Amino acid sequence: MQILVYDNLDEKQKEEALKRPAISAKDEISKIVSSIIKEVQEKGDEALIEQALKFDKAEISKIKITQEEITQASKRLDKDLQEAILVAYENIKKFHEAQIPHEIALETTKGVKCEVLTRPIEKVGLYIPGGLAPLFSTVLMLAIPAKIAGCEKIVLASPAKINDAVLFCAKLCGVDEIYQMGGAGAIAALAYGTQSVLKVDKIFGPGNAFVTEAKRQVSSDINGAAIDMQAGPSEVLVIADDLANEKFVASDLLSQAEHGADSQVILVCLSQDFAKKASDEVQSQLELLPRKELASKSIANSRIIIAKDLNQALEISNLYAPEHLIIQTQNPRELLKGVKHAGSVFLGAYSPESMGDYASGTNHVLPTYGLTKTHSSLGLADFSKRMTVQELSKEGFLALGKSVEILAQNEHLDAHKNAVTFRLESLK
């Protein structure tokens, strides 16, 4: 890994050191995705069946998975894996149940009652990528909060042939319908509906550049669907002092690097000696990984930055605004106070990112590409919306009436003023 001393860099070099890999061929991807969406809108299920063969090399005759197929998948699944999934399920459920909002009701002025009520989004679509690493854990991260929030209809899409663990998790979480469809076409089907696919109000879940672009396009169409967030390549930043275990640090860096060639990992440490030990350990562990080729490409986009102290390390982290922030120092909770931007934070030597990815209870769907400066990790609130209520008695109306008349008049909104004036006159 490239090693840089932060204080030796000029402003432009510092900016380059924290630069993320460019998302390539964006215009080309946009055109392809537009074409795929149009096909699904025009041909419905037929387009999805054709796309399954073209993109996923899967011959299918239907889109919707039957209950029998789900039952058989659960029977085939390894019992140890089932038990591990249940452990994760319970922790994720506990953490998200704790996020159930309390309704707010107060009297702002005598006779003026104001409330905040929460209501679930009615129909949600969950997208689970396929490929060599089936992300069945993402089913838990999406479906559990959807169920707790009270969404009336929860549907799930994943490329054919859907992994048994994905089907097991979907059944466990109470998903209503499962569709074997993938990529941009799946996003289009969820946004607009087909003969077999329910049109949803909001789409959740990660995916490749085509899925991300499809989510962007359908969310900008008033007839499409809302989305959870715009996701970029996965990333981690690790802050480590000289007493950190370089083996632990390297394993945390590589656990993120193996996600994909466009993932990025950054280590911020305090000395050349630790930087060298960590870099050597990364190379040693990398050689043993089955996904070595993917992780190697990610490591090429990554670097080690040497900070003069932990305060500067925090400054670097806040500038980068990582998806995952791991702090392996002697007093990690002390540093937490200075963290401004991060999707999820992992404190101490025994809090690897893997715990949050699977079973600690927090959600692993996180903003990337610097969006943690303005966006939050996925939570229960994303599956619901708030509405406000006000109720004024005659006494409350009279208390505010004159002030509202003056405010409306000065904004030159006469109908607003009249709505108050007519009522005031009726009470004389």
Curated annotation (Swiss-Prot):
Co-factor remark: Binds 1 zinc ion per subunit.
PROSITE patterns reported in the protein's UniProt record: HISOL_DEHYDROGENASE
InterPro entries linked: Ald_DH/histidinol_DH, Histidinol_DH_CS, Histidinol_DH_monofunct, Hstdl_DH
Presence of the UniProt keyword Phosphoprotein in the record: no
Signal peptide: none
UniProt binding sites for Zn(2+): Q256, H259, D357, H416
Record GO biological process: L-histidine biosynthetic process
Alphabetized GO MF terms: histidinol dehydrogenase activity; NAD binding; zinc ion binding
Chain residues that bind substrate: S234, Q256, H259, H324, D357, E411, H416
Cofactor: Zn(2+)
EC number: 1.1.1.23
Keyword Zinc: yes
Domain of life: Bacteria
GO terms for cellular component: cytosol
Pfam families with a match to the protein in the record: Histidinol_dh
CDD domains: Histidinol_dh (cd06572)
Pathway: Amino-acid biosynthesis; L-histidine biosynthesis; L-histidine from 5-phospho-alpha-D-ribose 1-diphosphate: step 9/9
Active site: E323, H324
Reactions catalysed, as given in the entry: L-histidinol + 2 NAD(+) + H2O = L-histidine + 2 NADH + 3 H(+)
Family, similarity comment: Belongs to the histidinol dehydrogenase family.
Role noted for this protein: Catalyzes the sequential NAD-dependent oxidations of L-histidinol to L-histidinaldehyde and then to L-histidine.
Protein name (database record): Histidinol dehydrogenase
Lineage: Bacteria, Pseudomonadati, Campylobacterota, Epsilonproteobacteria, Campylobacterales
Encoding gene (name): hisD
